C-alpha cells in the first residue's frame, strides 16, 4: 500500500539499534531504548501560510534525521513499524 503524508507531515523509519554491547552482551528488547534517529520514507508537500502560499519542506525521502524521543505517532504500514510526525518535530538532518 502506498502512503503519502499530508501537509507538513513526514513518514520516518527508525534505524535499527544494536543487538549487543561493545563488550558482547546481548541487549534484550525490554532494555533497549528506541532510537531517535531515522530515515525519511515520505513527505507531504508542505504547510500553507494563511495567504495560501506553500512553505516547502526542508527534508526529503532518503534523508537521515534526528528527532525528539517522544516525537511522532507510531503506525504499522505493510508490516513495517514507522512514525508519522510533523516536520517541526525533526531536530536536524544528518549528513
Swiss-Prot record:
- Gene Ontology cellular component terms for the protein in this record: cytoplasm
Where in the sequence is the signal peptide annotated?
Answer: none
> What Gene3D superfamilies does the record point to?
GroES chaperonin (2.30.33.40)
Where's it found, cell-wise? Answer: Cytoplasm
Kindly state a single biological-process term from the GO annotations of this entry.
chaperone cofactor-dependent protein refolding
Q: Which Pfam families does the protein's record reference?
A: Cpn10
**Mind telling me which PANTHER family this protein's record contains?**
10 KDA HEAT SHOCK PROTEIN, CO-CHAPERONIN GROES
Functionally, this protein is described as follows: Together with the chaperonin GroEL, plays an essential role in assisting protein folding. The GroEL-GroES system forms a nano-cage that allows encapsulation of the non-native substrate proteins and provides a physical environment optimized to promote and accelerate protein folding. GroES binds to the apical surface of the GroEL ring, thereby capping the opening of the GroEL channel.
Question: Assembly and partners?
Answer: Heptamer of 7 subunits arranged in a ring. Interacts with the chaperonin GroEL.
- The molecule here is called Co-chaperonin GroES
Q: Which gene encodes it?
A: groES
